[in-house]
Regions:
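Phosphate-binding loop of NTP-binding sites
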Residues: 1-91, 99-110
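Short, acidic/turn-prone active-site loops that include or flank metal/cofactor-
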Residues: 75-77, 96-97, 116-119
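Short, Lys/Arg-enriched charge-dense amphipathic segments
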Residues: 60-66, 115, 140-142
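Residue-level signal for inorganic ion chemistry
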Residues: 92-95, 111, 124, 169
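Short, solvent-exposed linear motifs at loop/edge-of-secondary-structure regions
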Residues: 107-119
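Adenine nucleotide phosphate-binding catalytic loops in nucleotide-utilizing enzymes
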Residues: 116-187
């Protein structure tokens, strides 16, 4: 890492067989507002030498050692045979994704639920074609250990995105300590 450079936040995307739309929408949102590296089975792309985020989508991972890793569990989620995760990893999942919830619980990592119900940690209290209101319904800690208190943040949308992609991007920004950027960026 370059001296003085911010460490790359790694986002590992698991599950979601046959659903490429969710990841492409998430990529679009992140790419507009920060620098990313995309790492997949057959591809590697990086916007710069030291990107803000590395999105890793590889099947059959057996071990993740990246510090402060974010594990995004998409549906449908098939429980991996064996995946060792760092203790400080954070799982992002829909509250309806019961397979992922059980797997995250067994792995012993922190979970943040994303969805449209009152039981979700991060939700949208409203959404239209050009705006949404993000609602952090309970306090969480970002990857640096800072507490993020419950808050509602108005978001500006450049186009219509599915709610899960918006929530994933917002969770990634929030966990990386960039929750304030959500008020200024265009999704």
């Amino acid at each position: 890492m370059l001296k003085g450079a911010t460490p790359v936040i790694s986002v590992f995307i698991l599950g979601g067989a046959g659903k490429p739309k969710n990841i492409s929408s998430l990529r679009d949102i992140l790419r507009k507002n920060c620098t990313i590296a995309l790492i997949g089975e057959q591809q590697f792309f990086s916007q710069c030498e030291n990107p803000d985020f590395a999105l890793v989508e590889i099947e059959n991972l057996s071990r993740i050692t990246a510090p402060n890793a974010i594990i995004l569990c998409k549906e449908p989620f098939e429980v991996p045979n064996v995946v060792l995760l760092p203790a400080d990893a954070v799982g992002l999942l829909s509250s309806d994704n019961l397979n992922a919830a059980e797997w995250i619980r067994r792995c012993g990592i922190r979970a943040i639920t994303l969805g449209m119900s009152s039981k979700d940690t991060l939700t949208l209290s409203s959404i239209t074609s050009d705006s949404a209101v993000l609602c952090l319904q309970r306090a969480i800690s970002d990857l640096s250990g800072n507490t993020l208190d419950p808050v509602e943040i108005p978001l500006s949308l450049s186009r219509r995105y599915d709610a899960f992609s918006i929530l994933c991007a917002a969770a990634i920004f929030s966990l990386s300590g960039k929750i304030d950027i959500l008020k200024q960026i265009l999704f």
